[in-house]
């Protein structure tokens, strides 16, 4: 890892979403392993998630953090909230996120809350429908955040001004 990457890693917020114990049954008994799901973000629109597997919890968490740093996306925020309401799904997990006024806070549950906190979203109303499996909820949240575009990008694609797009 270069010095620049170490400095970037120091300012990232890290959150552990889930640790799961799994068992492999063999002739002599069970062999236990652990999986970890983590999210990292700079609190300013960059966010990533990762999964790690190992025989011990700390090693699994470290692997997940490393994977999350390699899997970062940039989210275009409108101040400290979302640009517009977003729906997304991954598997059977469906998420709905909508911008909220100043002072609302993050109204979201579990895995979704962790992603939105480290992404730097401070005011949002969010709901999860269908499956609440943390892995699928995190992936669905990422799909929604990835799909969100700034009004400037949409205006440029349509050949209109930002004022026409926003109404």
From Swiss-Prot:
Record-level GO cellular component terms: small ribosomal subunit
Residues in S5 DRBM domain copies: 12-75
Pfam families: Ribosomal_S5, Ribosomal_S5_C
Superkingdom of source: Bacteria
S-S bonds: none
This protein's domain notes: The N-terminal domain interacts with the head of the 30S subunit; the C-terminal domain interacts with the body and contacts protein S4. The interaction surface between S4 and S5 is involved in control of translational fidelity.
HAMAP family in the cross-refs: Ribosomal_uS5_B
Stated family: Belongs to the universal ribosomal protein uS5 family.
Protein name per the record: Small ribosomal subunit protein uS5
Organism of provenance: Hahella chejuensis (strain KCTC 2396)
């Amino acid at each position: 890892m270069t010095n620049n990457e170490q400095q970037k890693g120091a300012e990232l917020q890290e959150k552990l979403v889930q640790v799961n114990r799994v068992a492999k049954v063999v002739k002599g008994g069970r062999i236990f392993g652990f999986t970890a799901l983590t999210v990292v973000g700079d609190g300013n629109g960059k966010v990533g998630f990762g999964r790690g597997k190992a025989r011990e919890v700390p090693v699994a968490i470290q692997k997940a953090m490393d994977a999350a740093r390699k899997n970062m996306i940039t989210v275009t925020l409108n101040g400290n909230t979302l640009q517009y309401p977003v729906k997304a799904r991954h598997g059977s997990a469906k998420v709905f996120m909508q911008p909220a006024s100043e002072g609302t806070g993050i109204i979201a549950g579990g895995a979704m809350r962790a992603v939105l906190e480290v992404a730097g979203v401070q005011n949002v109303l969010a709901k999860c429908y269908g499956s609440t499996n943390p892995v699928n909820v995190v992936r669905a949240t990422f799909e929604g955040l990835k799909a969100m575009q700034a009004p400037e990008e949409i205006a440029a694609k349509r050949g209109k001004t930002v004022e026409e797009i926003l109404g």
